[in-house]
Amino acid sequence: MGRECEITGKRTMFGNNVPRKGLAKKKGGAGQHIGVKTKRTFKVNLINKKFFIPELGKSVNIKISASALRSISKVGLSVFLKKNCKKIEDFI
C-alpha cells in the first residue's frame, strides 16, 4: 500500500521548494525575490500502531498518520472509524 494512512487515506504530496531572499515590503524592504523553484515531496508522518478492539477481543496493527492518531486518542477508535466511513472488519 506504500506510504498511505489506512484510515484517512493521506499519502505523499508533491510541491515546490521556493527559496526567497530579501526583506518583505511590509517590513520596510524592497520586496522579496523568488529564486528557482525545485520540486519536492511532502511525506506523511506514518506510525505503525497496535489497537485493541474490545468488541472483537482482538488486537489489530494499523498504519496511521500522526494526525489520525491524535484524533483517535481524543474521540476513540470506533467513533473515528465511523466518521471516516470505515469498518473495523476491514483491518482484521
Curated annotation (Swiss-Prot):
Single GO biological process annotation from the record: translation
Xref: Pfam families: Ribosomal_L28
Database matches in InterPro entries: Ribosomal_bL28, Ribosomal_bL28/bL31-like_sf, Ribosomal_bL28_bact-type, Ribosomal_bL28_sf
Membrane spanning stretches: none
UniProt keyword list: Ribonucleoprotein, Ribosomal protein
Example GO molecular function: structural constituent of ribosome
Keyword Zinc attributed: no
Entry keyword Transit peptide: no
GO CC annotation: ribonucleoprotein complex; ribosome
Family named by the database record: Belongs to the bacterial ribosomal protein bL28 family.
UniProt protein name: Large ribosomal subunit protein bL28
Gene for this chain: rpmB
